[in-house]
């Protein structure tokens, strides 16, 4: 679900329905009087019209709910796109933040930046991530995944070569033992 959809739901929550914007009509309440055994209680005459209005109201609510569910199922079938960016200068970070503000996921590879520039850019992206309620996860030594709030990233299975392995061997190479 996109940020725009969440914002629309938030606005819809605080707006009044069309039915509640109609002027309030005071309905006549039946008056109960002591009844003799020979008299039958009188029923109000407008009761059938009240139930017809209630049925119409229920039908319109049901129709609106069905449309909402149809829209949600269409949103669920939308494909998720992850943009891959290779920033070369600090100014490229603003484009990445614009993508995040547009509720898109971005995979950022800092391989074409110096370490100082990459840290500066990463600080900027981290601040924007907190403001926009996004997530920033490190997925490789120079790669980060920046996602909006509605995307969950599970990176517990990803092991970075710098964390667990020491020595001069790659991810799937065996260490040469000196004898």
From Swiss-Prot:
Keyword entries, A-Z: Cell cycle, Cell division, Cytoplasm, Septation
Disulfide cross-links: none
Compartments where found: Cytoplasm
Broad class of where this protein is predominantly found: cytoplasm
Protein name: Cell division protein SepF
Keyword Protein biosynthesis part of the UniProt annotation: no
Subunit structure: Homodimer. Interacts with FtsZ.
Listed InterPro entries: Cell_div_SepF, Cell_div_SepF/SepF-rel, SepF-like_sf
PANTHER family per record: CELL DIVISION PROTEIN SEPF
Family from the record: Belongs to the SepF family.
Role: Cell division protein that is part of the divisome complex and is recruited early to the Z-ring. Probably stimulates Z-ring formation, perhaps through the cross-linking of FtsZ protofilaments. Its function overlaps with FtsA.
GO annotation, biological process: division septum assembly; FtsZ-dependent cytokinesis
GO cellular component, one term: cytoplasm
Gene: sepF
Composition bias, Polar residues: 34-55
Organism encoding this protein: Streptococcus pneumoniae serotype 2 (strain D39 / NCTC 7466)
UniProt xrefs under Gene3D superfamilies: SepF-like protein (3.30.110.150)
Region feature Disordered, mapped onto this chain: 18-55
